[in-house]
């Protein structure tokens, strides 16, 4: 599979943003200008609106990290943070290795910002097969640094999160194919409830630049490799 160009990436950003009824404006539509909406001094949502979105799209589900630590999806991983999220599984031999290697490059480009200004999360789609040890070894193989956490949990909980953050198709046949859920990255600013997505095979420097727009809207971008 070829690495996607910027034109390809923008053309594929039709993946639906998270949205809840009357507060759908809280989520940035996936577009070329979406990140420009995250501006210094922007007002956070009301507590009521933020809670409403959280309850539908950011469930407080228990998970386990690659270190064996028990965490809650919303309270511990997402609340008050800038995050990126994707799905994979260890024995995937097609798209997953390419996307995960690309994310490793994104982390290198962002450097110490990951774990401080941005938190990266990768969830296994096969929690019955991928043990905590498997996640830890996979992470080590990729050379992942602090700030990039691999996660597992009960199969039904992983499925709940997958659907809640928008990695779900209405066609049950397509939705049941795990390879349909491993090619995209969901990213967002939780305090402002601004969310979008990008293809995991876009150029790593463009993904990093997009994430930096979310973190630091008016500072110099990462150096392209």
Each language-model region and where it sits:
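N-terminal secretory signal peptides and thylakoid transit peptides that target proteins
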Residues: 1-17
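N-proximal helix/coil linker or "cap" segments that precede and/or mark the start of modular domains
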Residues: 27-60
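Short loop/turn microsegments at loop-to-beta-strand junctions
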Residues: 58-59, 83, 182-183
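A short beta-strand-turn-helix
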Residues: 62-82
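Short active-site neighborhood of thiol/selenol oxidoreductases, capturing the structured segment around
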Residues: 75-97
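Structural microenvironment flanking redox-active thiols in thiol-disulfide oxidoreductases
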Residues: 98-161
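Thiol/selenol-based redox catalytic cores and closely related redox-interacting motifs
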Residues: 144-206
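C-terminal lobe and adjacent flexible extensions of AdoMet/dcAdoMet transferase-like proteins
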Residues: 201-225
């Amino acid at each position: 599979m070829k690495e996607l160009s910027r034109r390809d990436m923008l053309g594929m950003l039709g993946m639906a943003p998270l949205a809840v009824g009357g507060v759908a404006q809280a989520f940035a539509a996936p577009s070329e200008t979406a990140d420009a909406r995250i501006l210094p001094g922007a007002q956070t949502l009301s507590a009521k609106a933020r809670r409403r979105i959280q309850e539908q799209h950011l469930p407080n589900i228990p998970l386990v990290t690659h270190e064996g630590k028990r965490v809650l999806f919303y309270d511990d991983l997402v609340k008050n943070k800038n995050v990126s999220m994707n799905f994979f599984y260890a024995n995937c031999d097609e798209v997953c290795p390419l996307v995960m290697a690309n994310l490793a490059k994104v982390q290198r480009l962002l450097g110490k910002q990951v774990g401080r200004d941005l938190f990266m999360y990768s969830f296994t789609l096969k929690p019955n097969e991928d043990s905590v040890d498997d996640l830890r070894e996979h992470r080590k193989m990729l050379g992942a640094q602090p700030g990039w956490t691999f996660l597992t949990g009960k199969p039904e909980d992983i499925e709940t999160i997958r659907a809640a953050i928008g990695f779900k198709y209405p066609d049950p046949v397509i939705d049941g194919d795990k390879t349909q859920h491993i090619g995209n990255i969901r990213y967002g600013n939780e305090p402002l409830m601004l969310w979008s997505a990008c293809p995991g095979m876009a150029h790593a420097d463009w993904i990093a630049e997009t994430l930096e727009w979310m973190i630091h809207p008016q500072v110099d971008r990462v150096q392209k490799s």
